[in-house]
Amino acid sequence: HEHRGFAGTLSLPPQLLLDLVLAVGTDLAAAGFQRLVLLNGHGGQIALLEVAARQLHAAQPALAVLPCFLWRGPEGISQRIPEPERQRGLHAGLAETSLMLHLAENLVGPGRQADGPDQEPPEGWSLEGQAPCAWLTRELSSSGVIGDPAGASAELGQALFEALVEGWRRRFQSLLNSDWPPGSRRC
């Protein structure tokens, strides 16, 4: 719900997502699936999908449930994004805008101004990461942009895209080559 109040935003109650993951996962387990990867690209759903994964696995112990966040995982992604954008660029900032310039440039508007406050969370805290603060988009931005998209480019977007695809491909291949979850028997 952190983006509520901005045009085009649809927000679903958190319980609905939990119930949906549990229902779909239960049916997949009944159909014989042994693994379910929840690949998420929205930072506001990281913790919720981790809870959903744990609940689903508790209800269906034979189903390995792996909640993944697009930007966490592939090595080298964060190094391609300069500071302070690495910490601040959470929504329509440099990285996301660059990706969109690479994938669908016609959907990116010409004016890319950052309008969020310069104030940082207290020392030791962050907007996301190891010690996240709860926040709402309207507290950080009047436009919905959190970060600075001004330096975005299709070239950076292509580099990020290729690194994300290759990084996740390697990670999924590793999963396929494994016997995960522990104690499972595979044919």
Describe the predicted segments one by one.
Residues H1-V37, G43-C187:
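Extended, histidine- and acidic-residue-enriched regions that form the cofactor-binding/catalytic faces
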